[in-house]
Amino acid sequence: MAIAEWRQQLKLGEVSARELTDHQLARIAVVDPTLHAFLDITADRARADADRIDEALAAGESLPPLAGVPLAIKDNLCTKGIRTTCSSRMLETFVPPYESTVTERLWQAGAVLLGKTNLDEFAMGSSTETSAFGATSNPWDISRVPGGSSGGSAAAVAAGECMAALGSDTGGSIRQPASFCGVVGLKPTYGRVSRWGLVAFASSLDQVGPFTTNVADAAELLQVIAGSDPRDSTCLNVAVPDYCSALSQPMSGVRIGLIRECFDQNGLDAQVKRTVLTAAEKLQSLGAELVEVSCPRFSDGIATYYVIAPSEASANLARYDGVKYGYRAEGADALAAMTARSRAEGFGSEVQRRILIGTYALSAGYMDAYYKKAQQVRTLIRQDFDAAFQTVDVLLTPTSPTTAFKAGAHADDPLAMYLADLLTIPANLAGLPAISLPCGFDDDGLPIGVQLIANVLEESRLLQVAFHYEQAANVMANHPQGNFIP
């Protein structure tokens, strides 16, 4: 059920907010022992939120835009009075004394909090297997990963445990799991949505965005969470357009660029390539013009990212020293030993690996060769995008080179895991908005996602193209049943 449909049913009294909330909590009780999408379920809070909506409706009050909409929140967004762990032992008992800007805006808009979702530890991963509290499974095939790092949010939406969810995207952490789980995942322009209250991984790359079952709902959520925030100096102080009204704008004259370098990748699965190109042809049939474009440095994005992101992470995670908050190791006889032991015991192996990479890249004698060089390449990647947008409105690529892989398949091969974000990372480096939406299925019945990328602050155009494709292709109405969780 779409948010607009729910809103109508609520106003007509066909379903109450409490009834919908109880339905979602019952669904979670049935499927989450298998999926493990949630770390914490806030049932009492959810019922209280829903009751307030029903009481307001009974009193004749006008309802906010997300009244009674049951949501899940990735557990790296601070929620006041509710545990926020980042799926790490380091923050296992951390309860924030404040609310993140995005969640605050959701509650003001009437949304109902169902709980906090699992993720790769500190959002570092592409499979949700590095969580200190256990992996999440893919609803389409529980032997496979849901993607990452926002795998819990993607799986929860795909399995019908919530109507929508929030995630964060540093190098593809919304779009890649959206592709793997067959849902819509939107990464807004860097600075379009406040990061205040998002536990930082890589501050120049992180962005908050929604997971939904359809494009219109993504527009609804973005409408609520977008906008300037004086508490976040990187948040853009620009007007927020009406994203929902943009959906129905005609497609005639829209130019869509197919990035040559994306379709020439050696690791691109043949079924993924064929399905995404078919999606491009569908857009052409709707009135769009297809143009082949080149972004010569697109493939350099992954090497660039794995210098910049770990460097920023090594600085951001230095605050976890066992002194003020977070995990503190016992038995150390000196401050330095306590800090070292706290980090060794509190951080998982992938987080430690990235901290070490970042520390090395920033060290004396290597900073020029690695970090500064990576920033120069980042600028060149952005310039490639600038050149492409001189001739097209939207760029089209596969979201991921493959469909969801088996759990444990890349456990001993970090490089193979990193390559899962090969096609999503460049949009983060350039700060561009991008969306993944389902475009078909492989021979195993697993979802395939198509990625659309627009220029800075062109979310309206992005959502317009995605919406027209979704309405015409109607992909999810024809999905195979396969091993999808009951």
UniProtKB/Swiss-Prot annotation:
Alphabetized GO MF terms: ATP binding; glutaminyl-tRNA synthase (glutamine-hydrolyzing) activity
Tree of life domain: Bacteria
InterPro entries, sorted: Amidase, Amidase_CS, Amidase_dom, AS_sf, GatA
Gene Ontology annotations of biological process type: translation
Catalytic activity: L-glutamyl-tRNA(Gln) + L-glutamine + ATP + H2O = L-glutaminyl-tRNA(Gln) + L-glutamate + ADP + phosphate + H(+)
GO cellular component: a single term: glutamyl-tRNA(Gln) amidotransferase complex
Positions annotated as active site in the UniProt record: 74, 149, 173
Alphabetic keyword roster: ATP-binding, Ligase, Nucleotide-binding, Protein biosynthesis
Disulfide-bond pairs as recorded: none
Enzyme Commission number, as recorded: 6.3.5.7
Family from the record: Belongs to the amidase family. GatA subfamily.
Complex and partners: Heterotrimer of A, B and C subunits.
Function: Allows the formation of correctly charged Gln-tRNA(Gln) through the transamidation of misacylated Glu-tRNA(Gln) in organisms which lack glutaminyl-tRNA synthetase. The reaction takes place in the presence of glutamine and ATP through an activated gamma-phospho-Glu-tRNA(Gln).
Protein name, entry field: Glutamyl-tRNA(Gln) amidotransferase subunit A
Lineage of source species: Bacteria, Bacillati, Cyanobacteriota, Cyanophyceae, Synechococcales
